[in-house]
A protein has these predicted regions:
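Active-site/acyl-donor-binding loops of N-acyltransferases
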Residues: 119-175, 231, 241, 256-364
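Acetyl-CoA-dependent GNAT
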Residues: 74-82, 258-264
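Catalytic micro-motifs at enzyme active sites that drive phosphoryl/nucleotidyl and oxygen chemistry
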Residues: 48, 58, 76-82, 106-110
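Amide-forming acyltransferase catalytic core, primarily the GNAT-like/NAT-type
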Residues: 4-6, 11-64, 139-272, 277
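Conserved GNAT-family N-acetyltransferase fold
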Residues: 59, 70-72, 89, 94, ...
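Active-site beta-strand-loop-beta-strand hairpin of nuclease catalytic cores
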Residues: 87-88, 273
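Conserved acetyl-CoA-binding loop-helix of GNAT-fold acetyltransferases
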Residues: 93-116, 286-299
């Protein structure tokens, strides 16, 4: 058994820069970058859930040479249960070098706590990590994800003349298949106004809080503004956008938020641009359905987008998305842990307002 040391790094250490003395990053050992970019540092300091500098920013496991072999970043959020709001911990960047995973480093990092929160909320759980969260007795949720190809290069990678001809043929097919969506889109646009916002409107707070679910992560105006203004890497291509949906008298009907990300990681998708519908809501789902919002969001993305991802959270959305040309993909996974078992029915997925844009998933 290797001699391992676990350390807590606080937000105060992040702010004053002394966190750099705690470990030696092993960037080349991880499938993604070290994460702690200047952009992410600024985002975490500005996070509306981080109001106590003494709380944990990062849990890290190091070897005898003080080199990082595992880590988990932490930050604060809030959950709403009925009429009450509770502080909750959450995190991201949970990674362990492969050869140490059998040593239980991953479980140790998740279990290691200073009892700063009674609840822990997680989202975007990977397929590999999902069994670990189940073993740690999290209440786990799965929501069906969907994707829609917008540019043929997402599925066709031309290397010769035949490949380029195939790309052009696929491009024409995609445009023809999209004609029914365009017709529905313009019909819907005659009824509503879509306004791109740089300052998130105040009415969003109540619209989200009163959507009818017993449990949810608190997504108020301040939280949305933070997600609009910051992201993890700070690349020029990384964009978040917020849109209000109004009736013809400028009365709020709903909203949606999107993000665009250039794939930087090596692999077949490198250089492609992904669009994601990360948040949405409506005051009257009969007047503006979840599938309506996805239709509006589809045409809000820049023309450079290669593929769009979204979730089907309402019961009838999945069939509508399939008609719009979306295809199913692996489920989106999230979870909650109620350490003191305070809240009844907290593990009932039907009582939760679930969105792709939970925890840090928008700024990522």
């Amino acid at each position: 058994m290797p001699n391992l040391t676990y350390k807590f790094i606080t937000y105060k250490e992040l702010i004053d820069g002394t966190y750099k003395d705690a470990y030696i990053p092993q960037d080349d050992k991880f499938p993604v970058t070290s994460h702690l970019t200047p952009s992410l540092r600024n985002a975490m300091i500005a996070c509306p859930g981080n109001n106590d500098e003494s709380k944990t920013f990062m849990k890290v496991c190091v070897d005898e040479e003080n080199k990082e072999i595992g880590r988990a970043f932490c930050f604060g959020t809030r959950i709403k249960a009925g009429g009450r709001v509770y502080g909750a911990g959450t995190g991201f960047g949970f990674e362990v070098i492969e050869e140490y995973r059998k040593e239980g480093v991953g479980a140790d990092l998740l279990l290691m706590t200073r009892n700063e929160f009674d609840f822990v909320l997680v989202a975007g759980i990977s397929l590999k990590a999902f069994p670990l969260y189940r073993k740690l007795r999290y209440h786990l949720f799965e929501v069906q994800q969907f994707y829609k190809v917008r540019h043929a290069r997402y599925v066709v990678k031309p290397r010769d003349l035949k490949g380029w001809l195939s790309l052009e043929k696929k491009t024409v097919k995609l445009k023809l298949k999209d004609i029914p969506n365009l017709i529905k889109y313009y019909e819907l646009k005659r009824k509503v106004l879509i306004k791109k916002e740089t300052i998130v409107p105040e009415w969003v707070t109540d619209m989200v809080a009163n959507d009818g679910h017993q449990f949810m992560e608190v997504h108020d105006r301040e939280w949305f503004q933070w997600n609009l203004d910051y992201n993890t890497y700070g690349f020029d291509e990384d964009i978040q956008s917020f849109y209000s949906v109004l009736d013809r008298n400028n009365k709020p009907l709903g909203f949606f938020m999107t993000k665009e990300r250039l794939v930087q990681k090596s692999g077949p998708d490198k250089g492609l641009i992904r669009g994601t519908v990360v948040e949405w809501g409506a005051c009257d789902k009969k007047a503006l359905s979840e599938s309506d919002i996805n239709l509006l969001a589809m045409y809000s993305f820049s023309k450079r987008i290669d593929v769009i991802f979204t979730l089907a959270c309402e019961s009838d959305t999945a069939s509508q998305l399939l008609r719009m040309g979306f295809k199913e993909r692996a489920s989106f996974k999230a979870g909650i842990k109620d350490k003191k078992k305070q809240l009844e029915n907290i593990g009932d997925q039907q009582r939760w307002r679930l969105r792709y844009g939970m925890t840090n998933m928008i700024i990522l």
